[in-house]
Regions:
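Short amphipathic alpha-helical segments and helix-helix/interface helices
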Residues: 1-4, 42, 75-76
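Short, conserved alpha-helical segments within structured domains
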Residues: 16-20, 58
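A general alpha-helix detector
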Residues: 23-27, 61
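Active-site neighborhoods of divalent-metal-dependent phosphate/nucleic-acid chemistry enzymes
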Residues: 50-92
Length: 120
């Protein structure tokens, strides 16, 4: 929730992939069971986050990645291509071979707070 607040308050920019939107939609639909509410919540995500596409080149380059999970490797390639600063995930272990910066939500919030203190 704190990361959503940081994005809402424009302390950082949140980016999701189009694939992430379909995953979120699926999870919300399974837990809420109300199509209108799910669509309302997903629309809110569109107001908070930028949504980026994954290109075929992201998928191709991911095949050469040391990250064995293809979905995670594609995420790294997409993040790198769009110029993201980092990936925030609860699954740090899945990205241990990544040369791209990856943080847990807690680590990201700590980093964000440190950067705010430097700017003040």
């Amino acid at each position: 929730m704190e990361i959503l607040l940081a994005i809402s308050n424009r302390k950082c920019t949140g980016v999701l992939t189009a694939k992430s939107i379909t995953d979120i939609y699926y999870i919300l639909r399974r837990s809420i069971h109300n199509e209108e509410e799910v669509r309302r919540l997903v629309r809110i995500l569109f107001t908070l986050f930028e949504v980026e596409d994954t290109f075929s080149t992201d998928c191709e380059f991911a095949l050469d990645s040391p990250i064995k999970d293809c979905e995670n490797a594609i995420m790294v390639q997409t993040a790198s291509r769009i110029g993201a600063d980092c990936i925030v995930t609860r699954s740090l272990k899945d990205y241990k071979l990544s040369s791209f910066p990856v943080f847990s939500p807690e680590q990201f919030l700590t980093k964000l707070a440190e950067e705010e203190n430097i700017e003040e």
